Each structure stands twice: as structure tokens, then as C-alpha cells.
């Protein structure tokens, strides 16, 4: 790789890379922090910028720390372990506010302190790569800037009982041969954990589940693709709030950080208060991470989700927990919303949006200028959030408050939540 002379880093980008300039050209430098002087090696060159990796740190930032993970230099799983955890939070908040202002022309009236939880051993879900070469089976994560697999026997951001499975997997996969596994999912509920093996066809017998449980512990399930081979599927659940149980499968989307998710739910409940007998519309509701707690707290909730299987299972959970009278589940495509559909939701004065990374563009574009009165928006992408906030401001909404949610400690991903209230 081509080496370049020293530059001073003046910012951080949304991928956690240091930003510098050389001869007027922007350079994104993996592994560099703001205010550091570094030399770098070019990894790729575009017309308007250079991508690079740190070669030598000449003047380190006082915020730099030694990464805890022995695989950090090679593994692509974490991006920010070399940055003090408190500074990570402040840096994410700064980047989030910059995105809101630059892309959305918006600034929250009240910027709350970041919502944070455990920094280590917090992830209850992980996707593992597998590579077979001769007699060696590598199980781990994709390498930085590569599709190579970095074999790991621990992961410091995984919950302990999930991480404990890592050193057991290569030998277990070797025993499965000639069946080969393309990918592995590790998922933790409150009672059991699940090992999911992605194979090209259903090739495994339930006996392998018992063998895995004998190896890893009785609290494990074994799944092959979407089929539970060992254990009771209904045992895989979490409680978003006390009194509410949400059952899920390994393929379902759930927030990876249990403690931060619980804190986020409490924030959403507080911002949508008063809830007793109020009407709330929950868009992009998934299995009911927010809508089940909202109904439990007394709100009348209409929850809308695009995946029919999730809607059906959410409705089943509502019925099992005697919440059906306060929770209606609807299935529709929220990336194409009609005026007639909007009108059918007008009785709900409070709306909750929790879209995927693409944001809620179709919803906010179709929003009339009469309702709702307030919107709580949970975002996993500052760029699409800023775009949607700009549209909402043009329709009479005020960005009252917001905060970064540190759902993904040591990664560059930014989760956030905002409250917008109608002013006209």
C-alpha cells in the first residue's frame, strides 16, 4: 500500500474513520482519532477522496485507549475500541447533531444526554462467518476491508453465554461433515440461547441438537435455517418491560442490546404520556417491541408492520397476554402510503415511527398538515432521520428534544430518538 506523509485529523466520519486533508483532498483514515497526527497508507482512491488506514501515530489523542479485544486489529466487528467509551458517546452525539443540521436544517430545542448501558458483554445476537479450508474450520467475523474470516474464541461485546460457545463451534462443525454450514447465528433470550446453522438444505437430524446441548449446556436450542431441531421454540423470549413477554425466532429482528432497549422503551413511554386510554399509532412495529408495552400501559394502539408473519405473531402475543382489546395489528407496505390510509389513522394524536435504515420517507411525505399532535421517531440512520425531520418541519412540526441511544457500543452505528410536536 502506498504510504503518505503526516496529516492532522480534524473530524470523524459516520463509519468511525478519522477525516483529514492532503493537498486539498479529503482522506478517510481507519483507526485515526480527531486531533491526532498520523501517517497513513492508501487502501483505495476515489475521484473526490482517499480511503486509508493508519500507518504510524505520531501525536496520539489523549482520548486514545488500548483496545481490549485481542482480535481488534483484524476483526471487522468493532470500529471504535481504540476510543475512550465516554468520548465515543460525545463523538456520536456531535456527528448526529451535525447530520441533523447539515442534512435536515434542524437542531433539537433540548439535547438530552446519550442513553447508554453496558459497554461490554451486551450483545444478545451475533452473525458468524464460516470458512472451510482443508482440515481447518474458521468461525468468527469478517476481517476489516476483506471477506476473509477472522477466527475468534471470544468476543468481548457478546453476552458471556454466547461468547462461551465460540471455542466449541469448530469441533462441532467438523462433526457435522460432510454437511457444511454457510453461516451461524447466536441469539440469546432470557431463558435460553439459540444456535442457528445456515445450510443449503435441511440436512440435520434432531439428534444433533442433543449433542450440542451436551456440549454447550442444557439452556441451548439448535435451529437449522428456520426449523427448531432441539428445544421448545416458545422458550425464546425477552421481556421489554415487566409484565410483557415477547416471543421471537432467531430470524426475527430484535434490538441487540437488551438493557439499552429497555431504557429506550421507557423513554418512548414517557414521551408519549399520558397513555391511559390515549390513541397511539405505531408504524414499523415489528413484533411489538413498543406496541405491546404501550398497550400494557393502557394506550389504545394501532400497530402497522409490513411483514405479515410478524403481524400475525404480534396479534397472537397480544391475545395471549389479554391485550387484544387495546392493540390492533395491521399489515401494510409503509414505503407506499395513500392519503386514504393516512385519513384512517387520524384519530391517533400520538405517533411512533421506528423504521429501518431507509427511514420513513413515504409516511412523512404523505402526512397531512392537521394530525398527529406529536411524533416520537426512533432512528438507526442519522442521514434518513435528518431528511425526514426536514419534511416534518415543513409540515408544522417542531423538534422539541432528542438524544443519541448507544445501542451499539464500540461500533460507529448511531441509534437515536427524537420528539416532534405540532406547532401549527
From Swiss-Prot:
Alphabetically ordered keywords of this record: 4Fe-4S, Iron, Iron-sulfur, Metal-binding, Methyltransferase, rRNA processing, S-adenosyl-L-methionine, Transferase
InterPro entries according to UniProt: 23S_rRNA_MeTrfase_RlmD (IPR001566), MeTrfase_TrmA_AS (IPR030390), NA-bd_OB-fold (IPR012340), SAM-dependent_MTases_sf (IPR029063), TRAM_dom (IPR002792), U5_MeTrfase_fam (IPR010280)
Top-level taxon of origin: Bacteria
Catalytic residues of the enzyme: 380
Ligand binding ([4Fe-4S] cluster): 69, 75, 78, 155
Molecular-function GO terms, alphabetical: 4 iron, 4 sulfur cluster binding; iron ion binding; RNA binding; rRNA (uridine-C5-)-methyltransferase activity
Annotated GO biological process: rRNA base methylation
Enzymatic class: transferase
SUPFAM superfamilies: Nucleic acid-binding proteins (SSF50249), S-adenosyl-L-methionine-dependent methyltransferases (SSF53335)
EC number(s) stated in the UniProt entry for this protein: 2.1.1.190
Residue ranges of every copy of the TRAM domain listed in the record: 1-56
CDD domains assigned to the protein according to its UniProt record, in alphabetical order: AdoMet_MTases (cd02440)
Catalysed reactions listed for this entry: uridine(1939) in 23S rRNA + S-adenosyl-L-methionine = 5-methyluridine(1939) in 23S rRNA + S-adenosyl-L-homocysteine + H(+)
Pfam families: TRAM (PF01938), tRNA_U5-meth_tr (PF05958)
HAMAP family: 23SrRNA_methyltr_RlmD
Described purpose of this protein according to its UniProt entry: Catalyzes the formation of 5-methyl-uridine at position 1939 (m5U1939) in 23S rRNA.
Family: Belongs to the class I-like SAM-binding methyltransferase superfamily. RNA M5U methyltransferase family. RlmD subfamily.
Protein name from the UniProt record: 23S rRNA (uracil(1939)-C(5))-methyltransferase RlmD
Amino acid at each position: 500500500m502506498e504510504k503518505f506523509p503526516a496529516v492532522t485529523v480534524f473530524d470523524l466520519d459516520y463509519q468511525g474513520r478519522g477525516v483529514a486533508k492532503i493537498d486539498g483532498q479529503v482522506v478517510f483514515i481507519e483507526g485515526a482519532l480527531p486531533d491526532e497526527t498520523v501517517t497513513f497508507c492508501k487502501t483505495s482512491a476515489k475521484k473526490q477522496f482517499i480511503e486509508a488506514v493508519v500507518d504510524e501515530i505520531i501525536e496520539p489523542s489523549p482520548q486514545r485507549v488500548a483496545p481490549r479485544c485481542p482480535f481488534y486489529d483484524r476483526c471487522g466487528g468493532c470500529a471504535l475500541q481504540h476510543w475512550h467509551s465516554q468520548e465515543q458517546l460525545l463523538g456520536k452525539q456531535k456527528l448526529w447533531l451535525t447530520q441533523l443540521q447539515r442534512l435536515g436544517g434542524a437542531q433539537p430545542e433540548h439535547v438530552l444526554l446519550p442513553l447508554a448501558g453496558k459497554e461490554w458483554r451486551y450483545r444478545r445476537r451475533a452473525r458468524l462467518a464460516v470458512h472451510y479450508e482443508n482440515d481447518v474450520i474458521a468461525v468468527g467475523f469478517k476481517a476489516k476491508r476483506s471477506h476473509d474470516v477472522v477466527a475468534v474464541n471470544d468476543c468481548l461485546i457478546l453476552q458471556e453465554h454466547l461468547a462461551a460457545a465460540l471455542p466449541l463451534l469448530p469441533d462441532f462443525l467438523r462433526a457435522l461433515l460432510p454437511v457444511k454450514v454457510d453461516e451461524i447465528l447466536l441469539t440469546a433470550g432470557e431463558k435460553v440461547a439459540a444456535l442457528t446453522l445456515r445450510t443449503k438444505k435441511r440436512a440435520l437430524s434432531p439428534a444433533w441438537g442433543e449433542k450440542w446441548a451436551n456440549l454447550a449446556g442444557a439452556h441451548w436450542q439448535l435451529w437449522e435455517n428456520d426449523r427448531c431441531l432441539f428445544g421448545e421454540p416458545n422458550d425464546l423470549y425477552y421481556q421489554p418491560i415487566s409484565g410483557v413477554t415477547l416471543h421471537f425466532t432467531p430470524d426475527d429482528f430484535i434490538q441487540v442490546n437488551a438493557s439499552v432497549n429497555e431504557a429506550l422503551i421507557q423513554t418512548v413511554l414517557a414521551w408519549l404520556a399520558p397513555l391511559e386510554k390515549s390513541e397511539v399509532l405505531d408504524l414499523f412495529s415489528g413484533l411489538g417491541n413498543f406496541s405491546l408495552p404501550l398497550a400494557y400501559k393502557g394506550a389504545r394502539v394501532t400497530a402497522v408492520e409490513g411483514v405479515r408473519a410478524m403481524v400475525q405473531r404480534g396479534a397472537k402475543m397480544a391475545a395471549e397476554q389479554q391485550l387484544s382489546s387495546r392493540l390492533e395489528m395491521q399489515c401494510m407496505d409503509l414505503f407506499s402510503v395513500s392519503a386514504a390510509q393516512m385519513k384512517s389513522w387520524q384519530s391517533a394524536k400520538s405517533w411512533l415511527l421506528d423504521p429501518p435504515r431507509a427511514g420513513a420517507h413515504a409516511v412523512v411525505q404523505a402526512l397531512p398538515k392537521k394530525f398527529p399532535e406529536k411524533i416520537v421517531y426512533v432512528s438507526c440512520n442519522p442521514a434518513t432521520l435528518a431528511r425526514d425531520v426536514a419534511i416534518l418541519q415543513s409540515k408544522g412540526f417542531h423538534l422539541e428534544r432528542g438524544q443519541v441511544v448507544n445501542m451499539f457500543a464500540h461500533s460507529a452505528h448511531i441509534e437515536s430518538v427524537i420528539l416532534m410536536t405540532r406547532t401549527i
